[in-house]
Amino acid sequence: MNAPIIDPLQGDFPEVIEEYLEHGVIKCVAFNHRGSLLAAGCADGGCVIWDFETRGIAKEIRDNDCSAAITSVSWSKYGHRLLVSAADKSLTLWDVSTGEKIARTILQQTPLQARLNPGLSSPSLCLACPLSSAPMIVDFDIDCTTLLPVSVPEMPDVLAPPQRSKCPESNPPFSPAAACFNKCGDLVYIGNSKGEILIVDYKSVRVLALVSASGAAPVKNIVFSRNGQYLLTNSHDRTIRIYENLLPAKNVLKSLEDLGKNIDGLDGIEKMKTVGSKCLTLFREFQDSVTKMHWKAPCFSGDGEWVVGGSACKGEHKIYIWDRAGHLVKILEGPKEALIDLAWHPVHPIIVSVSLAGLVYIWAKDYTENWSAFAPDFKELEENEEYVEREDEFDLIPETEKVKVLDVNEDEEVDIDTVEKDAFSDSDMSVEELRYLPAEPIPDTNDQQDNLVESIKLIEGQISASPASEEAGQNGHHASSPQAEEMGETRGKRKRKPSEKAMELQAEKAKPLKGSGKTVRAKNRAAFDQETDDSINGGDDDDDAYY
């Protein structure tokens, strides 16, 4: 849709269900960095990748060792790798282009969510949030996991050393913690069961700052906006909170260390809270004051202007959209099915939501065209009106009154090689990004080939039993006999229609004749045979053919 003919007063958010995608029972979805590919995890352990431009399946990925439901899918920054977590406690890293498995590891707990490091072009490092364990960093290259802290002890000097092992021991059950990377991938933000947000350096496994939230409710989800300027948390107190990120986009670790050095007279938790207040500040809170419902899979829009959250109530498929100022602007109501996951398109105002039945619904904007943008004097009519033209409206304009054509430099070279950078893209142009997958033809199986051979034999049998074949047999010539080939008759060819003269003679032959019928019948029979021979040998070129 061209931007000039879109009404600028309309909100840039989805409004109606445009289409739905179906492939087994879908459990989770994720867009790649450009939004050209949509990955989905299925209940049978497989993954499917749709080309979102054509809405066709581009690739299917399946691990023979996994038959459990997929819990999350995550793209690498440039789209070459896909991380899949499953209910059988496995993490699998895939090469999207070739469909080959790069690495696979088994955790001690079921990972509810796993995310690849967004700061690496070919990441082999991911952040996993297990069901009953602390968030951990998983390194596929060395097959090692590192548990991250989820709380700050009273005495920071007695911090326990980080637990690094190939098979970390399972900890006592506790409320699961949510975690995510920042935009550059050098810090991890963890929301714990106390409602606190910990800023952790995952390389040294140190807590650098602490942010306390009001209410002290456990944090269920935590996610950054695409530009890294805002942080969203979803808590058990049915409130979505938006924090503004005060740290710079680059050299984040150095900035945090400088903040800690500039604070004197404080130690321990108080110092971390002071540093945290200079890292994040509460910007807005969102909640339904009437129903007090829980929220499912909240996230930002691609440009960060909108906040979206799904209703966690059973039996309803509702999506709430707010602007950053905190105003509820739209409620999208879908089918009577619970919502389990959703994602906002990185570039376009499109939302995809997953229902409990396993369908993927695509929500898009209902555009109203504004054709007056092409001509300022364009007037939209509510109904048909009779137009009376002026007397000189279509008269030829004299040469002296013609508008002078603007001078255009036709010799100037037009740049057709430079690609304009997307407004929301932060990709490095030096690295080739995977935007589309080539179409792969599906080879015929042995069963399909056998069915094709049987179909051909069946058709040949029907042709051999056709009336034309029976007529040829009655005349003493088989359809494939040499005599039939000499006469120009072969199976599958068209048969000549007798001429009008032959038809008339045949009709006269059937009538009873008076007088000496033997002589007349002999003459008619000779003429009819001669005409029939001419027809068979192609004597009548103007006759029509029939099957």
From Swiss-Prot:
Strongly expressed in root tips, shoot apices, vascular tissues, developing embryos and endosperms. WD repeats lie at residues 21-60, 65-104, 214-253, 285-332, 334-373. One of its GO terms (biological process) is vegetative to reproductive phase transition of meristem. Its main location: nucleus. Pfam families: WD40. Disruption phenotype: Eearly flowering. Significantly reduced trimethylated 'Lys-4' of histone H3 (H3K4me3) levels at the 5'-ends of WRKY70 and LTP7 genes leading to reduced transcript accumulation. One of its GO terms (cellular component) is nucleus. This is Protein RBL. It comes from Arabidopsis thaliana.
